[in-house]
């Protein structure tokens, strides 16, 4: 049985008592600001009962934008301001370029051989180059345009057929849409076990979030088993591995044109040609990255964008008017139609500010001792960049908690991590390599949902009754499904 974090922490304390007497935490004169901590568990008690990104942000407001967090055995630095984010992601970018080892990475990501979790070194550099030049290049992202358009149109038809006045579960529809787009991009076609594959990925993403007892007490292997996490991850990995093996074994031979290549085609071509030292497990790890990380982040962003627009009728009217005037009754949307729609892009940027997919950017690890702001940072120290706090820093953002797309009008701030008060995809060497693909998978689906339909809450609910509660997994999702009632907009060939 899988244990809760609270129960796991209690278990951890009990196990540690068997090994040594309780002692106070050691401190030095040259230590970062921190909250009071307990023996063994460190600061974990401050985070029990709250979402990790909100708990860490509350602590940062009290103890500073550069603070120490002791997570069990793991010493951690938390950066919660643009100033310190710039410092660690530029001056100390290489120093903090490693990834900490995790139980999930070991089991699910084929011994940390994917792009996201692989340690800094030659193998990671080759994967990063592969992403830049092949898998996630602008040309490759563009090559998937037709399948994005086709699947978005399928969503429109599905919603139109749902029945007048009936609520639509947009959470489920959007996740399924993005999963289908990415499976076709990854494998060249929809897969026959699509539903099972998607459910397995969902379960992995659910297990990935938060501070897990197995990762905060890495040396106490018994906790990995007692918590149930190792068994659960092993079981889910075996199912996933079997599915991917079936997909690869049924995959057709090489394409005649590189423009027709799926992501799997590219990886198999490079593996067979020995251009990269890729094993079959490496290929599967990278494919899982493309599918898993991309599905969760894009679907969450679309959901949050629609949620914020529902609560802000002024912005909803503005973005729908822009879309409908530009398209002028056109029945089928193509990506070229939305490239110049400035307010749609502002809506997405503001959504990513308030709801970054990874509010605590994927942790890094210190590769060598360094001195940061006069504080000595040992090797293996974990680094968390608190993007949630940075994106809502009132020193940089007026009315920081308010959804206001206009704030980005005539602003040089972009998503690429060059402005450190806005880091939806991180920055530096370990910045998310899939930002361009992710944006493409947000813009077109969102445009379809807003162009073809007007939306309202079911049962006459007031706008302020829309539940905006969060659920922390690999990304921060809505806690409850987004249920909305659509009314079809009349296009040139649709009178419905």
From Swiss-Prot:
Q: Which coarse location class applies to the principal site listed for this UniProt protein?
A: endoplasmic reticulum
Question: Which residues, by range, are in coiled-coil regions?
Answer: none
Pfam families on file: p450 (PF00067)
Which pathway is this protein assigned to?
Secondary metabolite biosynthesis; terpenoid biosynthesis
Glycosylation, residue list: 493
Listed GO cellular component terms? Answer: endoplasmic reticulum membrane
Supply the enzyme class, top level.
Answer: oxidoreductase
Record membrane topology: Single-pass type II membrane protein
- Protein name per the record: Germacrene A hydroxylase
Originating organism = Barnadesia spinosa (Spiny barnadesia)
